[in-house]
């Protein structure tokens, strides 16, 4: 509703762990749009369990949602992205990773940090491959933010988490929006293959503690 004043915003539900649903999503967009300027790969999942009892489905669900979906969505949409990109102003793909894919998290969410490290490396690999097609590919690595995925953690450990962040607060939507706008704008036309932490300094604090 907030975006309606800027134009039509269409929701297309899809299970991005399934190739046929990715294809259906692409087909719907392709029928309505001649090109695509920006693709944000933001679907995500996490799973928590202790090491000795971590289940296979907890591994597969997270990897399929966080990694597989990025590769195949980008693959499907690459031709639409090519149509809008130029040498001076490429089209953009923004992948959402995590600082847990850079540093070592405390929580027992084994498939999650592994998947986000994969997202960061996939970002670099695709950036190298698709630069010649006038497509910039970068990633944002958020730290602690208020989100559905973080709700239970914040209920239990919010004060501890805030104290561990050098900026002494939890991230807000405007923090992520600012990073995404930068990576979508002319200001980042000469930037591809980076992973941008948006974490209030959490990573440097972790390294200092080590």
Report each predicted region and the residues it spans:
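Alpha-helical segment proximal to the catalytic Tyr-Lys
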Residues: 79, 128-129, 189
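Active-site helix of classical SDR
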Residues: 74, 115, 123
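Short C-terminal tail/terminal secondary-structure segment
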Residues: 181, 192-210
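A glycine/serine/threonine-rich, flexible loop-to-helix segment
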Residues: 107-108, 132, 139-165, 175, ...
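Residue(s) in the substrate-gating loop at a strand-loop-helix junction
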Residues: 98
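Substrate-binding pocket helix/loop in short-chain dehydrogenase/reductase
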Residues: 50-51, 55-63, 161
């Amino acid at each position: 509703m907030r975006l309606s004043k800027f134009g039509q915003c269409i929701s297309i539900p899809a299970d991005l762990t399934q190739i046929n649903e990715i294809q259906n999503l692409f087909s719907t967009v392709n029928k309505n749009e001649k090109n695509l300027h920006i693709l944000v790969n933001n679907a995500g999942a996490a799973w928590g369990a202790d090491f000795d009892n971590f289940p296979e489905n907890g591994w597969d669900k997270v990897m399929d949602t966080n990694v597989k979906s990025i590769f195949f969505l980008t693959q499907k949409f690459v031709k639409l992205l090519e149509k809008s990109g130029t040498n001076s102003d490429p089209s953009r793909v923004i992948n959402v990773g995590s600082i847990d894919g850079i540093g070592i998290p405390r929580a027992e969410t084994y498939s999650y940090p592994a998947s986000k490290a994969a997202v960061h490396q996939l970002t670099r690999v695709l950036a190298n491959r698709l630069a010649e097609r006038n497509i910039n590919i970068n990633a944002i690595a958020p730290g602690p933010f208020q989100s559905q995925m973080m709700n239970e953690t914040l209920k239990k450990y919010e004060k501890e988490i805030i104290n561990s962040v050098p900026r002494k607060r939890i991230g807000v939507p405007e923090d992520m929006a600012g990073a995404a706008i930068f990576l979508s704008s002319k200001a980042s036309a000469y930037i591809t293959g980076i992973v941008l932490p948006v974490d209030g300094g959490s990573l440097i604090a972790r390294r200092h503690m080590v």
